[in-house]
Amino acid sequence: VYKGVLYLLAATFTFSLVNLGVKLLNEPNFLIPNPHSYPVHELVFFRSIISLSICIVVVTRKKIPFFGNNKVWLISRGLFGSTGLFLFFMTLQHLPLAIATTVQYLSPVFTVVVAIYLLKENVKWLQWLFFALSMSGIFVLGFESSENDAVNFWWILVGVISAFFSGVAYNAIMKCKNTESPITVVMYFPLVAVPITGIWCLTGEFVIPVGIEWIIILLMGILTQIAQVCMTRAFISDSASVVAPLKYVGAIYASLFGYFIFDEMLTTFAVSGIILIVSGVVLNTWYKKIYLRS
């Protein structure tokens, strides 16, 4: 088993818990019957400030150069990653959890496409068929918007844009794999996000958390740090075409969370879309493993 595969599976599950936190803070549930409606920039700020604090402690103790070496790609990682996260949190607030997460998992496709130009990675034609199979699942979700009033196709498009920005961010990570410590790569995400969202919180809408909401926000920050480290190590350990598609597995976690916690019922279109996506992922990983062995 590829080390990168294990790292990304761990990252995907942890990120799913963070996404669950966003939903818990915005929709009625058994933990918070009447949650505040948090603006997206505030959620990104809290998530980022906790992650940044942890990064600073680690970097200081290990005496790692604070700003790194490959600053252009590190800043690019922060900018594209922060923008992708902001747009993704918007979709979490406006779409069912499973659908918002599934649309976001187009990012592995964009990751591989961008890697062809930036990293000169070699992708076989059969892999493109598997990617197309996964993408067809996204298009099936488009039919969901015509059947379900809770699904607005506009927010699906926002999710696609978010996935593209995330795909570019993942390539920036791989550009830094030979020059930077993983913690430095992780740190640039909140290092860019905190000043931007912090100013936004000061000048725009801001909701003061209460009670258990503080605990959820704290856990979101800590889990984000764990997920970021696992994800960064995954992309450093293996090629984009092997690692990136495994992010799709998070759609399964999201479906279960949505069903059991928020009573989000999946229609035939939604289930079919998720099955297509996961099938494409499994086939791609299997093919790449066989190809490398040969």
Q: At which residue positions do the language-model features occur?
A:
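Hydrophobic/small/kink-forming positions within alpha-helical transmembrane segments
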Residues: T12-S16, L20, I49, I56, ...
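Transmembrane alpha-helices of multi-pass small-molecule transport proteins
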Residues: P33-F80, F165-A169, Y188-T203
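Glycine-/small-residue-enriched transmembrane alpha-helix faces in small-molecule transporters
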Residues: V1-P39, D149-K175, S294
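C-terminal-most transmembrane helix of multi-pass membrane proteins
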Residues: I252-S294
